[in-house]
């Protein structure tokens, strides 16, 4: 079923339908489309297009559909729907009948897809930040281990001056830190909600778009409807960040491929990231790194293609913009995969310190030290530079290093050279003298490692904030608990009960907005139940439920509670949190009395699970 058709007297040619349909790739926006639809149903309720009963019925069906998609997203591909919006509407109508046809009131696929895409970009962007953080952390850890490992530094792929392996690692940590900053900035700019912009001129209904934006977790609503549906800057910006970061990954890969080669022998990659040859049994090829280098062009191509697509589009929406997704999905997936592989390459890396030191001593890498020595003796640098160049030629002719020339030979190039010259020609001296901020002296490298470690530790990579509930949260908690109770998901709780138990509630929040809640319900000194767990639409599947449950587990431990239990229709979630299934018949009678409040008490489909805190404490003591 198409979302359009009254204007047409003939069906679309099947070849055109295949050409036009986008479900084969935009199915990845299913969860975002459903979340956006839930928020839109609330907006329609606020302007009396939907009754409260209708909105709750739609939301229940959409949440049910969301769970089905989470379990098997590829089921969508069996449909002949035009796009993900059509598919969601078809499924919704299948669940609630003609009521599902009311949901699109005041909404266009133009603002719908713009919202879906921003929701997806925001979620994917946060995962990419975690990927960058993981890679940087891995490299800093390697740097800590190799602060004293001398490595030849190169210019023009010729040995130039000695550095350390830690200093080399930290150079890429700096590059990835700029990528992290760029990505964070891009996510801030895209954090505006287009929903309610309609096809191009805005919705005809008096929707509170700021409230709508807040419901979806956006910083604010977009300010211009025409721009809202035309804007794909965020797509290009994310792909631009990906392209720059892939450039850094490619340079990293190239360095490591060279260092791993038989000619260098500086590092050895683990078997886990290398492959062999079908003909030559001795080969151990750095395929992971070569693929990182090779996939860089693929990401560049996606960015170039996207920019070519939008460069001459008139406002507002045009079908060309359907081409924004495949390149975006592929570019960000590729970037994420390459970061993961790069981190994996560092996980098992072996550095041959003897070989790197030997290489650093070759190539007259201490020539600049000799020039600086002459400058200290009063010779102008340009003249000193020339003298050392002649000395290098002489050493090459002798087949030896500068420090292997006799004092008499060195004095033949400049009479100011004295016996103390040999002290400054050592590798240790070469490193020690580079003591300005950012240099390779041991002190500066140690400082740089320490500072990098501090920056990473201070970085807020936690997407989920959980805190104790406050009295100021009462209205929100009452609304959340009532909502999930009306859907039959949780037991109802009165306002007075929530106020009484406020100290046992925990909430998740984003930028001050409460996005979920749960509480402990204590039966006696040794037993407690997790109740009223619910996460707002738009914030599910982002770790909030897990974080809230873990918070309550920790709180229960602090309160010396011996056992937690939960009654739920989502046992898989709690099994992942290390709960184990138990029989409801084993629960105390006073627990089961509370089931009298449950709207499903006569057709109970809840599963009982428990978490034995006393066993956890005992196992921790044994480990200690």
Curated annotation (Swiss-Prot):
Probable acetyltransferase: annotated span: 467-624
Location in the cell: Cytoplasm
Region (Argininosuccinate lyase): 1-466
Enzyme Commission no: 4.3.2.1, 2.3.1.-
Reaction equation(s) it catalyzes: 2-(N(omega)-L-arginino)succinate = fumarate + L-arginine
GO cellular component, one term: cytosol
Keywords in alphabetical order: Acyltransferase, Amino-acid biosynthesis, Arginine biosynthesis, Cytoplasm, Lyase, Multifunctional enzyme, Transferase
Top-level taxon of the source organism: Bacteria
UniProt xrefs under Gene3D superfamilies: 3.40.630.30, Fumarase/aspartase (C-terminal domain) (1.10.40.30), Fumarase/aspartase (Central domain) (1.20.200.10), Fumarase/aspartase (N-terminal domain) (1.10.275.10)
Disulfide bond residue pairs: none
Pathway annotation from the record: Amino-acid biosynthesis; L-arginine biosynthesis; L-arginine from L-ornithine and carbamoyl phosphate: step 3/3
Classification via CDD domains: Argininosuccinate_lyase, NAT_SF
Domain N-acetyltransferase: start-end pairs: 464-614
Similarity-based family: In the N-terminal section; belongs to the lyase 1 family. Argininosuccinate lyase subfamily.
The protein's name in its UniProt record: Bifunctional protein ArgH
Taxonomic classification: Bacteria, Pseudomonadati, Pseudomonadota, Gammaproteobacteria, Vibrionales
């Amino acid at each position: 079923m198409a979302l359009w058709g009254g204007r047409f007297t003939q069906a679309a040619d099947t070849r055109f339908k295949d050409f036009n349909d986008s479900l084969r790739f935009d199915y990845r926006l299913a969860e975002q489309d459903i979340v956006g639809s839930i928020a839109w149903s609330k907006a329609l309720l606020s302007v009396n297009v939907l009754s409260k009963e209708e909105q709750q019925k739609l939301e229940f069906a959409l949440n049910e559909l969301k769970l089905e998609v989470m379990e098997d997203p590829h089921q969508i591909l069996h449909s002949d729907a035009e796009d993900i919006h059509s598919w969601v509407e078809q499924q919704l109508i299948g669940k609630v009948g003609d009521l599902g046809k009311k949901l699109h009131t005041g909404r266009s696929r133009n603002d719908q897809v713009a919202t879906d895409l921003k929701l997806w970009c925001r979620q994917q962007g946060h995962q990419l930040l975690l990927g960058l953080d993981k890679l940087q952390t891995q490299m800093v850890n390697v740097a800590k281990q190799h602060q004293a490992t001398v490595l030849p530094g190169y210019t023009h792929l010729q040995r130039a001056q000695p550095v350390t392996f830690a200093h080399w690692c930290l150079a890429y940590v700096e590059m990835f830190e700029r990528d992290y900053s760029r990505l964070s900035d891009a996510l801030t700019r895209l954090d505006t909600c287009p929903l309610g912009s309609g096809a191009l001129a805005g919705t005809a209904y008096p929707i509170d778009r700021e409230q709508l934006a807040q419901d979806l977790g956006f910083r604010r609503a977009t300010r211009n409807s025409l721009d809202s549906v035309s804007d794909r800057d965020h797509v290009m910006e994310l792909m631009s960040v990906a392209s720059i970061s892939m450039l850094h990954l490619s340079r990293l890969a190239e360095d490591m491929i060279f260092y791993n080669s038989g000619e260098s022998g500086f590092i050895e990659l683990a078997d886990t990231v290398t492959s062999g040859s079908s003909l030559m049994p001795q080969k151990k090829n750095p395929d992971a790194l070569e693929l990182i280098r090779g996939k860089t062009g693929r990401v560049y191509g996606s960015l170039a293609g996207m920019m070519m697509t939008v460069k001459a589009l008139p406002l507002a929406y045009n079908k060309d913009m359907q081409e924004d997704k495949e390149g975006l999905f592929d570019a960000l997936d590729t970037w994420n995969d390459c970061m993961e592989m790069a981190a994996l390459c560092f996980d098992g890396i072996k550095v041959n310190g003897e070989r790197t030191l030997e290489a650093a001593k070759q190539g007259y890498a201490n020539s600049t030290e000799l020039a600086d020595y002459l400058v200290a003796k009063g010779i102008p640098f340009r003249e000193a530079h020339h003298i050392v160049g002649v000395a290098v030629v002489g050493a090459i002719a002798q087949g030896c290093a500068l420090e292997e020339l006799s004092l008499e030979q060195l004095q033949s190039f400049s009479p100011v050279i004295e016996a103390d010259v040999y002290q400054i020609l050592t590798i240790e001296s070469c490193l020690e003298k580079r003591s300005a901020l950012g240099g390779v002296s041991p002190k500066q490298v140690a400082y740089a490692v320490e500072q990098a470690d501090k920056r990473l530790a201070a970085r807020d990579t936690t997407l989920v904030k959980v805190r104790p509930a406050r009295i100021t949260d009462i209205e929100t908690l009452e609304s959340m608990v009532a909502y999930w109770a009306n859907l039959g998901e949780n037991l109802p709780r009165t306002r007075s009960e929530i106020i009484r138990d406020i100290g046992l509630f925990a909430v998740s929040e984003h930028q001050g907005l409460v996005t979920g809640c749960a509480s402990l319900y204590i039966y006696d000194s040794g037993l407690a139940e997790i109740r009223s767990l619910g996460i707002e639409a738009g914030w599910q599947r982002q770790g909030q439920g897990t974080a809230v449950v873990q918070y309550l587990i920790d709180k229960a431990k602090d309160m010396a509670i011996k056992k937690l239990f939960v009654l739920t229709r989502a046992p898989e979630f709690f099994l992942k949190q290390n709960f184990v299934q138990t029989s409801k018949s084993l629960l105390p009678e006073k627990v089961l009395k509370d089931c009298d409040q449950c709207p499903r008490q006569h057709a109970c489909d809840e599963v009982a699970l428990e978490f034995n805190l006393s066993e956890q404490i005992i196992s921790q003591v044994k480990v200690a």
